[in-house]
């Protein structure tokens, strides 16, 4: 039995996907993809599924997401799901299709929050007093 593990990251959200042979079930945090709310998040998570088409009929994917907010979790899960589909099937034309549609389906977003500097640490990394000319 073939098993594939992949990881997707977005800011502080980390998604771990496990793809196995099965009947096409996709679960995010043990919840079926069809029951995800709000609709925007469900539609964004459906993108790699729609692009893959009938290939997913023989793959089960379980995604566990921790950390971050709802949109960051959605982006991390989407990346992990896309990577799992490509790694499990091994089809290069599908990989090229994902990359041409949206690069973030396979490549995690490298941007992170900037650390706060010591001057006004609670106000943010670049907080300064407002300058008055008069």
Swiss-Prot record:
<feature type="compositionally biased region" description="Basic residues">
    <location>
        <begin position="118"/>
        <end position="134"/>
    </location>
</feature>
<dbReference type="InterPro" id="IPR020574">
    <property type="entry name" value="Ribosomal_uS9_CS"/>
</dbReference>
<dbReference type="GO" id="GO:0003723">
    <property type="term" value="F:RNA binding"/>
</dbReference>
<dbReference type="InterPro" id="IPR019958">
    <property type="entry name" value="Ribosomal_uS9_archaeal"/>
</dbReference>
<dbReference type="InterPro" id="IPR014721">
    <property type="entry name" value="Ribsml_uS5_D2-typ_fold_subgr"/>
</dbReference>
<dbReference type="GO" id="GO:0022627">
    <property type="term" value="C:cytosolic small ribosomal subunit"/>
</dbReference>
<feature type="region of interest" description="Disordered">
    <location>
        <begin position="109"/>
        <end position="134"/>
    </location>
</feature>
<dbReference type="GO" id="GO:0000462">
    <property type="term" value="P:maturation of SSU-rRNA from tricistronic rRNA transcript (SSU-rRNA, 5.8S rRNA, LSU-rRNA)"/>
</dbReference>
<dbReference type="GO" id="GO:0006412">
    <property type="term" value="P:translation"/>
</dbReference>
<dbReference type="Pfam" id="PF00380">
    <property type="entry name" value="Ribosomal_S9"/>
</dbReference>
<dbReference type="InterPro" id="IPR020568">
    <property type="entry name" value="Ribosomal_Su5_D2-typ_SF"/>
</dbReference>
<comment type="similarity">
    <text>Belongs to the universal ribosomal protein uS9 family.</text>
</comment>
<keyword id="KW-0687">Ribonucleoprotein</keyword>
<dbReference type="GO" id="GO:0003735">
    <property type="term" value="F:structural constituent of ribosome"/>
</dbReference>
<keyword id="KW-0689">Ribosomal protein</keyword>
<protein>
    <recommendedName>
        <fullName>Small ribosomal subunit protein uS9</fullName>
    </recommendedName>
</protein>
<dbReference type="InterPro" id="IPR000754">
    <property type="entry name" value="Ribosomal_uS9"/>
</dbReference>
């Amino acid at each position: 039995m073939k098993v594939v593990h992949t990881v997707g990251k977005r800011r502080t959200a980390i998604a771990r996907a496990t793809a196995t042979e099965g009947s096409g079930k996709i679960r995010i945090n043990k919840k079926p993809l069809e029951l995800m709310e709000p609709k925007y998040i469900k539609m964004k998570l459906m993108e790699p599924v729609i692009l893959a088409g009938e290939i997913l009929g023989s793959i089960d994917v379980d995604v566990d997401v921790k950390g971050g907010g709802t949109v960051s979790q959605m982006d991390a899960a989407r990346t992990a799901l896309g990577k799992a589909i490509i790694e499990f099937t091994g089809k290069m034309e599908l990989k090229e299709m994902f990359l041409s549609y949206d690069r973030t389906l396979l490549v995690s977003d490298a941007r992170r929050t900037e650390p706060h500097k010591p001057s006004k640490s609670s106000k943010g990394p670049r907080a300064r007093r407002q300058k008055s000319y008069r």
